[in-house]
């Protein structure tokens, strides 16, 4: 329902992202993308509404008739009514009657259960349907299989009564521009789906309101003023919520309100305004303000907590269902550039300024640093637990420092003296994080002081950048760790949670902390590591400014939302000392933005800076002219105040500089002196009449190179075992390439079940030859199309049910058989080495009818060569087919030549890089992180890195066959 995209949207005509993201690739949505999400309002030149045209996945174009929102359809007397409306209204009336009939003590628990049921039906039920529709077109396939939309006159519809019911219901609701028989099946399916949505959403809202009524009461000893304030705030929030919903529906219309783009797309020009300029995902963020307003009016913590649960479930729905569909539908990776399409600069990028491919001078002088003004590729990022690397001094220091702070906080008493020390420590670190770090960035912006220091000692700008990231990271960690320690010392556990506003303060405080965490994550997702660490202070980035993510709505989210958690701590502790720290933090953060960030942005981008963000513009539009003038006057006062402060600082700067220089010299001299999953196997009972001899599987694949066979005789065997293998037959071992597609030919009786399927398993996973007892984990393909309600299991079907006449069979059998072919590739393969088999299963169950010959997937170990140039070329030659297989041989991802760049999907989906590093490790004995593959970008760069790594590791290798990572080598 919340179809206003808030991330990865490019707004080129408005300029700024308050910190430029030079090294991060930005996904750009086409107008069709925003159109399809429903942020549209099509008008002709005269301002009148025009017809809307829809487009189904198969390219069918149709007229989308005008429809109305659910409330109007149900309650407006001017709208036509049908049986489904009566059913919905009857169910809503039953809810109200139940509240009236239940005894007082049962109302709250009963309606809590009812509301949670409808909320689960919304987020889990509708979410499951939409997820499957997005990935497998399940709802449309159900309609196709049941043929409920096929005219019974054709004789193909086994459910004529259902057809007549749907036809009457839908044509009653849409009297103009709609014909049930002529509309595409996707559109009819969507119309039926939205009737289900109407029922669930209306029951969800009504049951919530009834639950709030059941819980509502007047608090004991509450003053009249507090009651008036509570109800006034609640009413304001509800009215604001109502405006958000109405304005959102005005913008997105019914198409996006009912998730129409899961079924079809519409062709329209777009407008992007209203509530979608105010907040990301307004339907799911600020669109739930009314829940908290109702909680205030009900004066019930039960209503508040169930509102929080509902809000959290809605965000889970957004993250798990809507966002993946948006990315898949509207953010496809850009097409990969071929070698012929690349510019000369791209082809010759591996020159002296490349950290990957060395020049001959670099070969002669191995320690000569390379200098580049371009931002470095981020391979080993700092932020996030998943990037924690204890081999890195920055991460080790961070962990040790946090452990030390935690230990001191827990082990010391909470006496006034220790409380003062911890608060003072937090204040000092906040001063350092804002003023100290700000001073260094100011010097870097104006004089490149930080970079000059490292260049002075022969280091590269990249080294200066890495050291800066470590310094900033440690400063940030100490700032917040010391603040948390001070909060811990000042916090007193409540003796009575029901006293006064204690519980409310904790709930609001936790909410503000969560808001700051979400804001920080959103900022990092928008800026990337380069922007997070102020990379445009160190490298010349792009002069083009873009707004995406949270910056579409706010110029500086750090200004308010970025410190919400600090004020949450104030609410939780109710401490004057923590209030002082919060004020100090906020003032210093505002000063940092005003005196450090803004001047640098103005110097880099000048007039292209955006003055008002989306939220500010929306608020200004809603203000009367007099208040707009007042807003301008206030802005002028603030600007003049900041200019006055800047003049004072400029006057005092020489004295401060002398003092700082003396302090630095003295300090320098001083330092120089000192789950388990359960799988249930379903056994079919109708196997009678099927002969397993009529079933067979034949496997074909790309044979592995001869390098894989060299390990069969390693010298570790006995004398007899070293002899050539004596085969009593003409069948050789099946050894296939890693990641190469595998073709499976099957035979079965003519009357085999259309729901038969073939799965891929490790040989050691199944002890039974009759029943498969482990999950295929998605590695299966149906033998016939249309048998299952998803499309994934049909990917790989080549042909099905080709009849083999009795005279065509080689084994003398006189029965006709059916045959077919499927191809296992990509995610349907095991991306590891081992011995595997295919199993043919009967009728969507796990009864095994045939098992293929076992086959081995093996990665051949690379043989060393002495000459470096030959090694470089041969490594490239060996890597290219492996990498193509790792990239599913997709022409949009996999390179055709060693100098072609990888497709952009390699950066977005980490599985491809992980496949490559596993293969490289097995082939060459060198272990890389997946980010290395993404950063290298071509087979040639990766081959050079492999050769260089092997030369570096050669002195430490204990392998007689060449360099490898010693501790990882397994014999």
From Swiss-Prot:
Pathway: Phospholipid metabolism; phosphatidylcholine biosynthesis. It is found in: Endoplasmic reticulum membrane. The chain crosses the membrane at residues 86-106, 110-130, 196-216, 224-244, 278-298, 301-321, 390-411, 418-441, 474-494, 497-517, 576-596. Keywords: Endoplasmic reticulum, Lipid biosynthesis, Lipid metabolism, Membrane, Methyltransferase, Phospholipid biosynthesis, Phospholipid metabolism, S-adenosyl-L-methionine, Transferase, Transmembrane, Transmembrane helix. Residues 10-20 have a biased composition (Basic and acidic residues). One of its GO terms (cellular component) is cortical endoplasmic reticulum. Pfam families: PEMT (PF04191). Residues 1-30, 330-359, 699-723 are annotated as: Disordered. Its EC number is 2.1.1.17. Residues 107-109, 217-223, 299-300, 412-417, 495-496, 597-971 are cytoplasmic. Residues 21-30, 342-352 have a biased composition (Polar residues). Belongs to the class VI-like SAM-binding methyltransferase superfamily. CHO2 family. This is Phosphatidylethanolamine N-methyltransferase. It comes from Aspergillus oryzae (strain ATCC 42149 / RIB 40). The lineage of its organism: Eukaryota, Fungi, Dikarya, Ascomycota, Pezizomycotina. The gene is cho2.
């Amino acid at each position: 329902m919340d179809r206003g995209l808030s991330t990865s949207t490019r707004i080129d005509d408005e300029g700024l992202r308050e910190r430029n993201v030079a090294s991060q690739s930005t996904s750009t949505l086409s107008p069709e993308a925003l159109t399809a999400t429903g942020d549209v309002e099509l008008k002709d030149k005269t301002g009148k509404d025009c017809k809307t045209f829809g487009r189904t996945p198969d390219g069918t174009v149709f007229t989308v008739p005008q429809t109305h929102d659910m409330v109007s359809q149900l309650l407006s007397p001017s709208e036509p009514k049908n049986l489904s409306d009566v059913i919905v209204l009857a169910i809503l009336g039953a809810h109200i009657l139940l509240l009236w009939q239940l005894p007082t003590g049962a109302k709250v628990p009963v309606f809590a259960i009812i509301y949670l049921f409808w909320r689960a039906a919304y987020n889990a039920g509708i979410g499951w349907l939409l997820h499957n529709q997005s990935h497998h077109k399940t709802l449309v396939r159900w309609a196709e299989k049941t043929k409920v939309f096929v005219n019974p006159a054709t004789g193909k519809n086994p459910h004529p009564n259902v057809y007549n019911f749907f036809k009457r219901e839908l044509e009653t609701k849409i009297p103009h521009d709609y014909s049930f028989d002529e509309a595409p099946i996707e559109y009819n399916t969507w119309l039926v789906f939205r009737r289900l949505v109407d029922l669930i959403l209306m029951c969800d809202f009504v049951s919530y309101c009834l639950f709030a009524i059941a819980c509502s009461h007047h608090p004991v000893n509450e003053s009249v003023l507090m009651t008036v304030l509570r109800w006034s705030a609640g009413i304001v929030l509800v009215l604001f919520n109502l405006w958000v919903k109405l304005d959102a529906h005005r913008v997105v219309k019914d198409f996006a309100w009912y998730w129409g783009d899961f079924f079809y797309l519409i062709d329209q020009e777009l407008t992007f305004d209203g509530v979608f300029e105010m907040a990301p995902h307004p339907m799911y963020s600020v669109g739930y303000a009314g829940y908290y307003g109702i909680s205030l009016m009900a004066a019930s913590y039960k209503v508040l907590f169930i509102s929080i649960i509902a809000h959290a479930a809605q965000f889970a729905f957004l993250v798990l269902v809507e966002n993946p569909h948006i990315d898949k539908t509207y953010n496809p990776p850009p097409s990969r550039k071929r070698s012929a399409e690349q510019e000369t600069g791209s082809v010759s990028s591996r020159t002296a300024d490349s950290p990957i491919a060395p020049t001959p001078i670099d070969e002669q002088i191995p320690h000569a640093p390379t200098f580049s003004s371009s931002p470095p590729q981020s391979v080993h990022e700092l932020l996030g637990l998943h990037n924690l690397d204890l081999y890195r001094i920055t991460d080790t220091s961070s962990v040790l420092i946090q452990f030390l702070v935690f230990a001191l906080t827990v082990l010391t008493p909470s006496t006034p003296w220790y409380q003062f020390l911890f608060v003072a420590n937090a204040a000092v670190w906040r001063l350092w994080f804002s003023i100290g770090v700000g001073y260094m960035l100011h010097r870097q912006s104006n004089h490149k002081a930080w970079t000059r220091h490292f260049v002075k000692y022969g280091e590269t700008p990249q080294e200066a950048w890495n050291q800066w990231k470590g310094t900033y990271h440690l400063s940030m960690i100490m700032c917040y760790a010391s603040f948390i320690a001070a909060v811990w010392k000042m916090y007193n556990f409540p003796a009575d949670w029901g006293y006064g506003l204690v519980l409310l303060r904790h709930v609001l405080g936790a909410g503000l902390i969560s808001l700051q965490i979400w804001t920080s994550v959103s900022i990092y997702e928008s800026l990337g590591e380069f922007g997070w660490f102020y990379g445009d202070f160190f490298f010349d980035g792009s002069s083009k400014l873009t707004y995406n993510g949270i910056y579409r709505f706010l110029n500086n989210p750090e200004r308010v939302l970025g410190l919400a958690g600090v004020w949450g701590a104030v609410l939780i502790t109710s401490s004057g000392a923590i209030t002082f720290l919060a004020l100090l933090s906020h003032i210093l953060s505002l000063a940092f933005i005003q005196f450090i960030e803004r001047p640098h942005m103005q110097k880099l981008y000048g007039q292209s800076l955006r003055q008002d963000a989306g939220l500010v513009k929306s608020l200004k539009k809603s203000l009367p002219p007099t208040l707009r003038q007042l807003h301008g006057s206030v802005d002028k006062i603030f600007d003049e105040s900041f200019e006055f402060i800047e003049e004072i600082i400029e006057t005092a700067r020489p004295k401060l500089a002398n003092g700082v220089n003396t302090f630095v010299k003295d300090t320098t001299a001083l330092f120089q002196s000192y789950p388990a999953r359960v799988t249930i196997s379903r056994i079919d009972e109708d196997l009678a009449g099927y002969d397993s001899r009529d079933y067979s599987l034949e496997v074909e694949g790309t044979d592995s190179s001869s390098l894989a066979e060299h390990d069969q005789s390693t010298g570790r065997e006995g004398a007899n075992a070293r002899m050539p293998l004596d085969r009593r037959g003409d069948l050789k071992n099946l050894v296939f390439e890693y990641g190469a597609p595998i073709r499976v030919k099957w035979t079965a009786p003519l009357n085999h079940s259309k729901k038969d399927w073939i799965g891929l398993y490790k040989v050691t996973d199944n002890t039974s030859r009759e029943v498969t007892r482990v999950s295929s984990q998605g590695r299966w393909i149906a033998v016939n199309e249309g048998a299952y309600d998803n499309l994934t299991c049909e990917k790989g079907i080549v042909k099905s049910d080709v009849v083999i006449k009795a005279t065509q069979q080689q084994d003398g059998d006189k029965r006709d058989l059916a045959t077919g072919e499927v191809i296992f590739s990509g995610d349907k393969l095991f991306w590891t080495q081992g011995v595997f088999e295919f199993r043919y299963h009967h009728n969507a169950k796990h009864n095994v009818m045939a098992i293929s010959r076992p086959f081995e997937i093996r990665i051949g170990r690379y043989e060393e060569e002495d000459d470096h140039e030959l090694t470089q070329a041969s490594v490239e030659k060996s890597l290219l087919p492996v990498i193509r297989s790792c990239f599913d041989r997709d022409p949009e991802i996999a390179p055709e030549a060693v100098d072609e760049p990888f497709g952009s999907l390699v950066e977005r989906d980490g599985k491809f890089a992980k496949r490559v590093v596993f293969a490289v490790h097995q082939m060459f004995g060198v272990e890389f992180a997946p980010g290395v593959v993404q950063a290298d970008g071509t087979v040639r760069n990766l081959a050079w890195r492999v050769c260089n790594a092997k030369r570096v590791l050669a002195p430490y290798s204990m392998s007689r066959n060449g360099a490898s990572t010693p501790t990882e080598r397994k014999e």
